[in-house]
């Protein structure tokens, strides 16, 4: 059985916030998909509140698409310390960092959360614009490293 990539990462050694290129997947038809670990919070020490994380997910899913072509999905991590970004092509973490910083600045300017209704969202009552902005502000202040060990 194939190993789960994220379970192979020693979460005790990483230093958040960071952006990590997890893997490059090669499809049977020559297509490529890159997966990134966008870690906002320190594993096993911090975690997002669900409403803030859910709000940030909606906002980033919307804003990142203005800067990055080929986004497949932005998915919250079950541990609530960050997000996974899947995108078409062989992409680099530096490109993701630039787009993420732009998008987080846009989050700070947001007046509402996109798709915050019962038609477009399966849990629209659990969203926090205030919380999303607080995490965006903190992440921008701390800065995202491209070195997961913070060196």
Swiss-Prot record:
GO terms, molecular function: iron ion binding; S-ribosylhomocysteine lyase activity
Record-listed E.C. numbers: 4.4.1.21
Manner of cofactor binding, per the entry note: Binds 1 Fe cation per subunit.
Organism: Clostridium botulinum (strain Alaska E43 / Type E3)
Role summary: Involved in the synthesis of autoinducer 2 (AI-2) which is secreted by bacteria and is used to communicate both the cell density and the metabolic potential of the environment. The regulation of gene expression in response to changes in cell density is called quorum sensing. Catalyzes the transformation of S-ribosylhomocysteine (RHC) to homocysteine (HC) and 4,5-dihydroxy-2,3-pentadione (DPD).
Classification via PANTHER family: S-RIBOSYLHOMOCYSTEINE LYASE
Root EC class: lyase
Keyword Secreted belongs to the record: no
Protein's name in the database: S-ribosylhomocysteine lyase
InterPro entries: LuxS_sf (IPR037005), Metalloenz_LuxS/M16 (IPR011249), S-ribosylhomocysteinase (IPR003815)
Record's keyword terms, sorted: Autoinducer synthesis, Iron, Lyase, Metal-binding, Quorum sensing
Catalysis performed (reactions): S-(5-deoxy-D-ribos-5-yl)-L-homocysteine = (S)-4,5-dihydroxypentane-2,3-dione + L-homocysteine
Iron found in the keyword field: yes
Any matching Pfam family: LuxS
